[in-house]
């Protein structure tokens, strides 16, 4: 995504308004604004969060919060479903990555009238000890739904589980990605096509345009994204 700042610098006031409105009209920016509105995304450069991985981050995304808002929930369902229908009309089933994408995946499967399953991070330690919950058959063409992509590790682990089960993973659709190079390389190596509703660049762009953050915060966020494992240490 090209930065709006480079194009806007030498424009008239009216042209600036037009460029801002045009930038805000993309799906990535529309959804980014919606996430910011419900505080599903928090940008706190001066009071960073600690992720489960141990990374210190000025950025936190909780897409599960979208489930609490009916209109936003419907928006996510419709947009994810639209992408699956347009890009993967041959899909036989939808699989969600536990636990964050179970609800989103089920919503998409319901909208498209497709079977649904979800993939655990590890097999259950009781009962049938299933890793994949559902009724997926060998040879099925499956689209994976994920809520968030950071390093891509857990997402691609689910893909591998489905492949081991005998399914053909034809693509993954997620609500959000940080766009870390390590994730992009991992998806490339795993031969998995990834499509997302929004991304880091769109969120930062919208947050700056709407006054959620200041320009100096943008520089700090970019520093973090360039080296997230070491930032803040």
Model-found features: residue ranges?
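Short, glycine/charge-rich flexible loops or terminal/linker lids adjacent to PRPP-binding catalytic cores
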Residues: 105-143, 151-156, 210
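Conserved acidic residues
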Residues: 92, 140, 170
């Amino acid at each position: 995504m090209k930065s709006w700042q480079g194009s806007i610098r030498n424009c008239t006031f009216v042209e600036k308004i037009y460029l801002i409105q045009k930038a805000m009209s993309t799906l990535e920016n529309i959804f980014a604004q919606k996430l910011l509105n419900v505080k599903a995304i928090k940008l706190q450069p001066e009071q960073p969060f600690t992720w489960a991985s141990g990374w210190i981050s000025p950025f936190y995304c909780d897409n599960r919060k979208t489930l609490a808002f009916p209109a936003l929930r419907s928006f996510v369902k419709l947009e994810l479903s639209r992408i699956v229908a347009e890009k993967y009309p041959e899909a036989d089933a939808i699989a969600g990555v536990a636990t964050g994408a179970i609800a989103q995946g089920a919503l998409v499967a319901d909208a498209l009238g497709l079977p649904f399953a979800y993939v655990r991070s590890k097999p259950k330690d009781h009962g049938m000890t299933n890793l994949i919950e559902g009724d997926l058959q060998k040879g099925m063409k499956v689209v994976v739904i994920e809520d968030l992509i950071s390093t891509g590790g857990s997402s691609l682990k689910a893909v591998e589980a489905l492949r081991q089960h005998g399914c053909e993973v034809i693509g993954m659709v997620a609500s959000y990605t940080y766009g870390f190079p390590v994730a992009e390389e991992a998806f490339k190596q795993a031969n998995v096509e990834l499509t997302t509703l929004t991304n880091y660049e769109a969120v930062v762009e919208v947050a700056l345009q709407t006054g959620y953050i200041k320009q100096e915060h943008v520089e700090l966020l970019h520093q973090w994204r360039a080296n997230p494992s070491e930032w803040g240490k």
